[in-house]
Every structure is written in C-alpha cells, then in structure tokens.
C-alpha cells in the first residue's frame, strides 16, 4: 500500500515593497518592486497572481512562480504613473483567494507615496534662478563701484 505524502499549505506574504524614483513628481513612471515570500517549507509549486493597486484602480497584474523550495522568495514588478497627492499603493497576493494557504491574513501590504506636482519643482527652480540673478547683479555693482573709485 502506498500512502501519498501531502505537501503543507503555503503561506505567502509580501515582505517588502520598493519604488523608484524615491521622490516622484506628477507624470513620472514609478517602478514598484515587491518581494513575495513563502513562509512554509516544502510546499508544492505554485503560480500565484499578484495585483498592484492604487486603492481604486489596478496598476498591474502579474504572476509569481514558486517552485516549492524552503523559504522561497520571488520578486515581481509593476509600473504606476504618478499623480499629484498622497497615495496608498498596495500589493495583493491571490486577490481572488484561488490558492488555499495556511494564513490568508498576510496577503497584502501597502506603502504611502507623496507625489508633488511638477509646478512645485518649477517654483523652486524659479526661486534659485532669481537668487542667482540677484547675486550676479550685486557682484557686478560692486565691481563697477570698485572700478569707479580707482579713477
């Protein structure tokens, strides 16, 4: 008699979300990179849907492929076009609950990103240009006064 050995149920969790650029402005293409880890040893191989969301809209849906090895980690990415304001971006593992897991409560992680408008950066640039012009004007004025006082 052969008794099959069942693999334990997996436990997938989002361990990290990184984004680049770190300080996006409106219109930037922001690359989100999520690390997904199976916390259970020796579970069976699995293809897992991963959803990137901005809370309202789906940013990207991709697939993480796990081989069933011990403490396996897989990295997945999505690209989001930055809009102005504060955002809570979310990565959700198996959003439709198609895969049975030993723990379904750790299948999502959120990050907060603040996006400034491109105009904010333009305002700072304008101020720097204005300050530079004032400094150049002062230096030129002092040079003229120095020149006139020598005559």
Locate each region found by the language model.
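Extracellular/luminal regions of secreted and cell-surface proteins that mediate adhesion/ECM remodeling
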Residues: 1-123, 129-133, 137, 141-150
